[in-house]
């Protein structure tokens, strides 16, 4: 039977000093012997998805203490990708995932903590906390801050929903007046919470539901709604129960590595493909597999992407549906129910509620349930008032969206496509794979695209070219040396794709990169090209006006040049000596911390994790 980890710091005469310090934090005589549970918060005033989390940590802590534990809260960092985007700040976003995981490990191990509740929300924070949970393998519960309400503006006497991407797009549109832009800017992000579409943050929070590490509704219930409070209260209760079961009853079935198996990672990517989630989720699931030592690779994702139907389109893939609409349609378990009907899921896996996925689907499927509490829960909707406060409104829809023909969630028979919203492309340009969010392609004829390359060695140069009309219809923009190692940091390319959209070129051009894309990206945008340019990938040898062939139907990405020409270009590149496979004209200041990240970073097909085998101990 495992011993409480915290006993290391509280038992025995020689731990008098440690106990004295625990007492100084408020621990009483009667508390010693209770499990010490960390509340890992990510409150910050920099990020709307985290602005409201300050009090929520205390909410969870009080519930832990009521339930028989000692709660101790600490914070991680949290970067807002939207604010960091379009300048050198984005270099720090992906590396922050590792920094978050490491900082949690340091705090948990240094203080011999028994378990943790992770309060996350936005893009790299949820993945960083997931990596930490798998690394530490102690009882863990996830509860996120929840999605933002969609923005609303009045256009021709009709309410139109908008989000952050609309503000970016109109910011680049020369035809948008300053008055109209200001109205959009003030309306796009009306409340606290993670941005209102199926971008990276909400995609990852939805995946924690199917992974079994959070409660139903965690990914879809609005940050502002009163019902969300119960998720935090429940987290405090459940973590104490699960912690005692592990340490006192030797029950390891609900540890992160027991829950997150290869079959469960498959469930997660199946959900992601069917709901057209962010392509960044692929990166994070691969990193989780690495952390848990699970043999889950791009080939597994490729095989699943060919047979999972696309059942849901939410902004940025749709201008009609947002996270508030997704929740009304049953959220994650609404989609899982449809996927289970066609036998795509492994439903025997347990979750933190100690329920199998099968039982959880049956209980929370809005098409089946007669439970008034569950019906009321999924009726939660937007308050449509600007606020930075959680639990500040209690609006409920009079009717749920149970339409599986043309509603927010569809059945297989009425799917948007037979194969899902994400696809893996391979070929000589992406030997180890690349990712495209097919859910974001509205023009089906764009699934086969061929054109001349326009090559740029930084996102900044590509943006300049787009905004100054150097890009023409039919071009394929190549942005290289923006991978995990080459960037370093694998920047998101939301600005280039948004600017293409603002200039009416999003359906007439393609963009390929060894960098990555925001969950808000649309159009023919292929990222995660592996190996990246800095790891001697063929993308480093593409020249202007080379013809590139993209075939999403056949899952291929090819540079149309001969093997002899490739050999000559390799020789020429390698003759650059120590400067081989580095950008030729880029002016970019790289900090020491980013240089360290670059030294160990792997390409996207490995989840952009650090290759620790480069370190000899």
Curated annotation (Swiss-Prot):
It comes from Buchnera aphidicola subsp. Cinara cedri (strain Cc). InterPro entries: Dihydro-acid_dehy_C, DihydroxyA_deHydtase, DiOHA_6PGluconate_deHydtase_CS, ILV_EDD_C, ILV_EDD_N, IlvD/EDD_N. It comes from the Bacteria. This is Dihydroxy-acid dehydratase. Keywords: 2Fe-2S, Amino-acid biosynthesis, Branched-chain amino acid biosynthesis, Iron, Iron-sulfur, Lyase, Magnesium, Metal-binding. Functions in the biosynthesis of branched-chain amino acids. Catalyzes the dehydration of (2R,3R)-2,3-dihydroxy-3-methylpentanoate (2,3-dihydroxy-3-methylvalerate) into 2-oxo-3-methylpentanoate (2-oxo-3-methylvalerate) and of (2R)-2,3-dihydroxy-3-methylbutanoate (2,3-dihydroxyisovalerate) into 2-oxo-3-methylbutanoate (2-oxoisovalerate), the penultimate precursor to L-isoleucine and L-valine, respectively. Its cofactor is [2Fe-2S] cluster; Mg(2+). [2Fe-2S] cluster binds at residues 122, 195. One of its GO terms (cellular component) is cytosol. Pathway: Amino-acid biosynthesis; L-isoleucine biosynthesis; L-isoleucine from 2-oxobutanoate: step 3/4; Amino-acid biosynthesis; L-valine biosynthesis; L-valine from pyruvate: step 3/4. Belongs to the IlvD/Edd family. The keyword Amino-acid biosynthesis applies. The active site is at residue 518. It catalyses: (2R)-2,3-dihydroxy-3-methylbutanoate = 3-methyl-2-oxobutanoate + H2O; (2R,3R)-2,3-dihydroxy-3-methylpentanoate = (S)-3-methyl-2-oxopentanoate + H2O. Mg(2+) binds at residues 81, 123-124, 492. The modification N6-carboxylysine is found at residue 124. Pfam families: ILV_EDD_C (PF24877), ILVD_EDD_N (PF00920). Binds 1 [2Fe-2S] cluster per subunit. This cluster acts as a Lewis acid cofactor.
